[in-house]
């Protein structure tokens, strides 16, 4: 949320977010990836095209669990790029405590 103003700023016709994604695609798989929050409005950031076009690079997606994104909605949020997503729900896991982590992981697997 703190970086919204920067990430939605325009560099020519595209947002900074879209430009970063384009650069990551040029570098290619294996050398670069992007971070896209699972709770972000992709339209606002000018990157809604990731739902219809596979980015071809890994996407680290924080925001699952405690921040509100549901693993079951991963494909809706990321569309054609969803196979590239590494969902992150570390806050939910640490908040669950050591006695509940295994149960939370099992529940998360069922959502996928």
Indicate residue ranges for each PLM-predicted region.
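Generic secondary-structure signature for well-ordered alpha-helical cores
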Residues: 22-29, 76-80, 110
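Conserved anion-binding
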Residues: 1-37, 56
């Amino acid at each position: 949320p703190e970086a919204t103003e920067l990430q939605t700023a325009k560099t020519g016709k595209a947002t900074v977010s879209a430009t970063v994604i384009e650069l990551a695609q040029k570098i290619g798989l294996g050398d670069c990836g992007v971070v896209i929050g699972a709770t972000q409005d992709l339209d606002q950031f000018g990157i809604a095209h990731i739902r219809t076009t596979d980015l071809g690079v890994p996407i680290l997606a924080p925001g699952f669990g405690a921040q509100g994104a549901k693993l079951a909605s991963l494909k809706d949020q990321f569309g054609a790029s969803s196979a590239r997503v590494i969902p992150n729900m570390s806050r939910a896991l640490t908040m669950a405590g050591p006695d509940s982590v295994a149960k939370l992981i099992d529940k998360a697997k069922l959502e996928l």
